[in-house]
Each structure stands twice: as C-alpha cells, then as structure tokens.
Amino acid sequence: MDSTTGIFFWGFLIVYGIVMFLLSPKTVSLGGFFKGEDKLGRAANPWMITASIFIAWIFAKSVTNAANMGANFGIVGGIGYAMYWLCIPLTGWALYRLRRKFKATGMISFLTEHYGIAAVFCFSAAILVRLFNEVWSNTSVVGAYYGASGSAPFIIAALLFTAITVGYCCWGGMRGSIITDVAQAILFAVLLVAVLAWVVPQHSLADFATSGTWTLGGGVDFIIGAGLQCLSYGFHDAVLTDRGFICEEKKMLKSFTVAGLLGFVAIVLFSLIGVHAYLDGMSIAGSSAPVVVAQSLGIMAFFMMAVIMIATAGSTLDSTFSSLAKLTARDLPGILGHTPKMNPRIIGIIFMIVFGIVGNLPMIMGADIITATTISGTMIMGLGPIFLLHGVVKPTKVGFQLAFWVGMVLGIVDTVAPAALGFMDIGGGSYANFLGVNLWGAVACWAAYLIPGLVAQAAEKRAGIEPTWKGLSREDLARLDADAKRREQQGLDLDPEDLATTGA
C-alpha cells in the first residue's frame, strides 16, 4: 500500500485502540474482572451477553474461513461453515440443564465434583490449547491486511493489535470484554451491510442461492461433519461457557439461542463474499476470499474489510484473554485448594501478557488458520456425551477418560497421519475424511461414555442402592424457583465479596 493508504490503515488501528481503552472500565470489582458484574455486583445484562457471544464467535478467522468455503463450494460451503453456530443454542441448553438440575456453578467445579481432578486437568489442557489457537489465528488475519504473511508490516500490525487488546483487558477483565464486545458487534453489523451492498448487487439472488452442488463432494460432507462437531464443539470454548454462568439460567439460555441464530445468519451472509468469487471464477490461491474480493472492489472496500477483521478479531481476542485470566487465576487454583498470596487479578494479567507473546509465535511462523477450528473440533468429540448425557446414565471417571481420549487420539492421528484413518472416509469429496472420522469417532466416543455408566448403573441396581446421580427432581426445582424469587424480591442475591474493587 502507498504512504497515504498506509497512514489511513495504521491510523485506524491506533484510533481503534484508543476507543477500546476509553470504552473499557478502568476500575472493576473482582466479580467484574472475572465474572462480568457491574460495580453493584449485578450480573451483566442478558442482551449484552447476547451481543458478546454473537461477536466473540464471529472470529476473524471464522469469517475468513466462511468466505473461503463460499469461494470453494458456493452457498453450500457458506451454510456448512455456519453450522458451527448452531452449537451455541445446544451448549446453552446443556449448561441450563447442568445449572438447574445439578447446581453447576462453573465447568471446572462441575467436573471436579463429578469426574475428579484428572478429568479437570484433561479438560483444562484442551481449553488452554483452544485459547492459544485463538491468539495467533486471529492476529494473523489482521496482519494480512497490512502486509504479506511473514513480512514486517504483517508482524508489526499483528503484535500492535495484540498489545492493544491485552492492554484494555488488563484494565477491565471480563466486564471490559463484554462492554467492548457490544461496540464491536455494532461496528461489525454496520460494515457487513455496507460490504454486502457492494457485493450482492453484482449477481441475482437466484445465482447466490443456487451456487454450488448439494452432493457429498460439493460440500455436503462438510455440512454433516460440522453438524456432528456441534454436539461437542461449544464445550471446550471457555469464552462461550464462561458466559453460561454469569446471569440467571433462563436469561442465559435465551441469550445463547438468539446469539447462535444471529451468528448462523451472519456467517451465511458473510460467505456471500466468497460465493461472489465462486460465481466470478476468482482464484484465491495463496490468499483468502475476503482479501481477493475486497481488493477487486477498490481501496475503500478493502479498508472496510480490514475494519471488519479488526473488530471481529478484537472481540474474540479480548474474550480469550478474560477467560484465560479466570481459568488460571480463579478456576485452577480453586480445584487445587490453593489460595494464591498474589492478587488474583495480577495473576490473570501475567498470564494474559505471556499468552499474548507466546500465542503469536505460530503467527510469525506462518501456521494455517483453518487448523485452529477443524483439528480442535475433531479432538474434543468426547466432550459431547460427557455434558449432554450427564445424569442420563451414572457418571463415571472411566467413562469420562475413555470418551475424552478416544476423541483426542483420533483427532491427533487424523492430524499427523490422516491416511491412517482413510478406511473411515465417507464419499470422495474434499471432506470425506473429515466426515468419516467425525461420524465414526462420535459413535465410538458416545459408546465409550455410555457403556461404563450403564455397567455401574446396573451394579447399583443389583446392590439395591438408590441412585443419587440423577440430579434434582421437578419438585426440588419448583421449591428452588420459589426461593430464588423470594431472594430476588428481598435483594439478597448480591455477593459482598464480589463488590471489593481490584484497585485498578
């Protein structure tokens, strides 16, 4: 880009950083830093949570992947990638059930109580890998609008963007993340409409709707595979699950449902940028559909696309850092029964900074952004039955470990030696292996969880032991609802400990 254009692009990145710092609260309580509460200890507004989930899941890498799928498979590819957003309502329903029926207050504490410390460390390791992936995969997308991969402008833009995000997260924590997410969601929606106003009129709606072929080889294999991953994908995303415990259960479920449906629509709409490239026969080799299409429409369209990527990457990255702080400063010390002498906020900030540095190493090395989604999605297939079937059969530590590691091993093998699992392929399309491994892998993971539970359940029945693992009855839930309503009316729901400021 020439000097004038460069000033425009770099200037926006700096202005973006200033605005985010101004929006993020400078002084928050511990409850605000780790749970998103306001200064009075009240949970975040459900509509703020909806906006936060919506934009935090519109990752820079995800909209890029959606457009690339549209460029490769037409509208079939766009719908396929949008399938992932349907896991948000499913995850919301599962968390609603766990909170209501089993009194879960968080993923880590829930696993500790029902599956033991070993299960928690397996789960936490998967979350940390996911959070690590989110750093480099999003900063690399932003860097691509400032220079070629690996170039000095590419790396500088990505690192500056990371520094901006870490900076305002250190001030506001999860509360700051949720507040800035609202602004980023509005910015994304406005610019998406503007970009589509350039792209959509170039073809008829019929052309968009009929692009691609509805066959396994035409991308339907990816649609089915993504649908299977929806059964487990949301549970290893700390950004999503953390927001499942910060407001009342029914409000949370509504927020998750609305955010998931809005996200599905937004991803399909964004994929039309790639579908435009598909219809025009544009080559995206060595680049990405958003970059190629935006460049073909002129510098203003290219700039607007860059702003979209910055907004979406920022929302994901700040949510990633706030969830990382909660996991490392609150959740993991809690399960170990250890209370750190250092201020938990400081611990969280230290991990944010370390992850901000280490998490960018793959970006500098030029890793492929698609791997952050497809590999992790395959590896964590075993989480689906653990959270969806809890209480349907007796929960067992053996069942957790079998389900978790069957999925993890299949995912690792599929990454390092996919040919070894070629016998699982379904169809002959580009995603034949993806579909086969996820279908047969899901069957194996669910069986691995169910069988030990059924065996333990049968043993209890023979011994005449009354099951205590089925959770609260309907009568118990009705009594709790009545008590919660009384407490709300009397203003007894605030936690005085959460009102203590963090001193920043």
Predicted regions and their residues:
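Membrane-interface "cap" regions at the ends of multi-pass membrane proteins
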Residues: 1-63, 169-175, 185, 191, ...
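Terminal cytosolic tails of multi-pass membrane transporters
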Residues: 25-30, 39, 421-504
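Selective recognition of specific alpha-helical transmembrane segments in multi-pass small-molecule
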Residues: 11-12, 125-136, 187-197, 222-234, ...
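Helix-loop-helix module between adjacent transmembrane segments
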Residues: 20, 78-170, 229, 309-319, ...
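Membrane-interface helix-loop-helix modules in multi-pass membrane proteins
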Residues: 35-104, 228, 240, 245-282, ...
